[in-house]
Amino acid sequence: MQKKETLEFQSEVKQLLNLMIHSLYSNKEIFLRELISNASDALDKLRFLSISDEKIKIKQNKLCIFIDYDKNKKSITIQDNGIGMSKKEVIENLGTIAKSGTKSFIKSIEKSNSEKNNQLIGKFGVGFYSVFIVSEKVLVLTRSFKENEKNGVLWESSGKGEYTISNIIKKDVGTEITIFLKESEKEFCDELNIKNIVLKYSNHINFPIKLKTKITKDNKILTPEEKKSYTWKQINTGKSLWSKKKSEIKDIEYKEFYKNFFNDNYDPLIWSHNHVEGKQEYVSLLYIPRKASWDIWNREHKHGLKLYVKKVFIMDQSSEFIPNYLRFIKGIIDSNDLPLNVSREILQNNENIYKIKINLTKKALLMLENLSKNHPDEYKLFWKEFGLILKEGPSEDIKNYENVIKLFRFSSTYINSENQEVSLEDYVKRMQSGQNKIFYITSDNYLSAKNNPHLEKLKEKKIEVLLLFDRIDEWMMNYMTEFKKIKFQSISKYSSYLENIFKDENNDQKNTEQKLSTIILRIKSYLKDRVKDVRFTSKLTNSPSTVTTDENDITTQMSKLLISTGQESPEIKYIFELNANHPIIKHVFNIEDKNIFNNWIELLFEESILSERGNLDDPNKFIHRINNLLLSNIIRLN
C-alpha cells in the first residue's frame, strides 16, 4: 500500500458534515438506504457500459450487493461489484460536492427547522455523508473497472474535516464501504435490524441484496461449528412487480401484491398499471380499494402514493401526485427522473411533478369510468364506500370537472329507492321533451327529500328529480353547475322556468287564483317582514302550502351546513307559496274572523317551515295551535 495522503474536505462539505451529524436525518436508518442505492447505481452503470461496449465483459447474474456486519467491531460493510471509482473520482465524489448553489443550500439548511433539514439535503444528492450520523469512522475500498488491481483506492475519514486516501491492491472491481458505528448506534449492527431496513427501503432494487445470515436448521440441533457459521442469503424480492410488463403479470399477482403491500384483507376493486416513457420516465400502479380505511375521514389521515426513485423507497403518503378528492387511491409511483432524496418541498414546487399528477388523475378517473361501465355491481360498492369523497371533486378540479361528475350516482324519483344508482347520463337520456334543466332537491335524508311538497307537480308530470341528501350535497352544488351544458336547477328555489312547467294549459288554475287573490294581501298584511313574498304556485297538488327561497338567496340546506360547521348563516326570508286549488286554502279564504284567519295562516306557515327545515324555533307553540284548532272543531261538531 502506498503512503497515505491527507486532504481536507471542500469547505462546504465541512459545513455539511457538521450539520448532518448534529441536525439532519432524524430517521438515522436512511444511511443504509443511501449506501444500497449508491451500490445499485454502480451496478446499473457497469451493466449499461457492458451493453454499449463489447470490451467490457461481465456476468449479469453475478452483479450483486453484499451486506456484512461484525457485532464485536460494531461495523457494517456494504459491498458491490459495480463500476467502481478511480482515485480522481473518489476525490471528486467523496471530497467535494460538485454542485452549483452549494453555499446557498448550506444557508437554507442553517435557517430551516429540523424537519425541513431532513428533506433539503436531498436536493444536492449528498446522501453518502449520512453515514457520519451513525459512524465514528468510514472506510471506502474501491477499484474502477478501468484500472488494474494495483490501482485500488482506500479512502478513510471520521467526518471531522479531513480524509486520507491511498492506493492499495484490490483484486475485484467494485466498491466496499465499511462503517464503524458509534456506541450509541450499535443497534444497527444486527441481522434482523439490517434485514428490516432493507425490506422497508430497498426491497425492490433490481439486484440481489445478500445479507450475512446465521445458519439455521428446521427442528435440528446445530453443532458448535455450525452455530458460528454464516451464509449469504438474498433478502430482497428483486424485480418489483410494477417494473414488469403488464402482459407478464396475472390478475392474481396484482391482487396478492396489493393485499401484501398495502396490508389489506380484501382484493382491490380495480387497478391501473402504466409505464410512461419520453421526457418523463416513471411507472405507476394505482389501486381502488374495496373498503375505506377506518380513519379516512380523520383530519390527521395521511394519504398519497408510495414514492420510489429507481425502485428505491423514498416516502409514504406522497399526496402531491394525486388530488385530495382521490385520496382513497392506493398505489406506487416509481420515477427515474427525481433525485433520490427528493423532499416534499421539491414535490410541491416541481413542474414535472405537476405534470405527473395531471396524468395520474386522468388515469385514475378513467379507471373508475371503466369500473362503472364494465363492472356496475362493483362500482356500486365503490360508490357506497367512497362516493362522498369523490363529491369533493367539482370544487377542486375544474379541468376534469365533466369526467368527475359523470362518475357520480344519485337517488331519484325515477327509481323510487334510497340507493344512489342514477348517473347524470341516465338522467339526461330520460329528460322530457322541451326540458332543458336537470332538476334536483337537497334535504336531510331520503324520506324528507322523497316526500317534499316541491316534488308533487313534477311527479304528476313524470319529470325526474335527483334526490340529494348527503351532507356535502348542498355545498357541492355550488360548484356543480352544469352537465353537458345543461344547467342544474334546485326545485326548492323559486324559478319562473319551473312555474311555467308547473302551469297547466287550461285556465282553471288562473281563474281560481284570481278569485282568491285577496287572500294574498291578507296574509302579507299579517306576516309582514317575516316573509319575502306571498304568492300562488302551481307546483303543489296534495299540499296546501310550502315555502321556497328566492333564486339568489341562501338555501335552507346551506344555512344548516354553515351552522353545523360553527359559521354564521344569513337569516332566510322565505317565499310563502299557496295551492289555490287546495280545500284548506279555499276554506281559509272564506274565514272572516281575523284571529281565526291569522291562526290558520300561522299554522300553514309553520307546517311549511317544518316540512322545509325539519324543525321549528318553537315546536310547542305549533302543537298548541294544532290542539286549539282540533278543539274548536270538536266543539263545533258537538
From Swiss-Prot:
Q: Does the keyword ATP-binding apply?
A: yes
Q: Which residues form a coiled coil?
A: none
What superkingdom heads the lineage? Answer: Bacteria
Subcellular compartments: Cytoplasm
Residues annotated as transmembrane:
none
Gene3D superfamilies to which the protein is assigned, alphabetical: 3.30.230.80, 3.40.50.11260, Heat shock protein 90, C-terminal domain (1.20.120.790), Histidine kinase-like ATPase, C-terminal domain (3.30.565.10)
Q: What does the entry list under GO cellular component?
A: cytoplasm
PROSITE patterns listed in its UniProt record:
HSP90
Q: What is this protein called?
A: Chaperone protein HtpG
| Upper lineage | Bacteria, Pseudomonadati, Pseudomonadota, Gammaproteobacteria, Enterobacterales
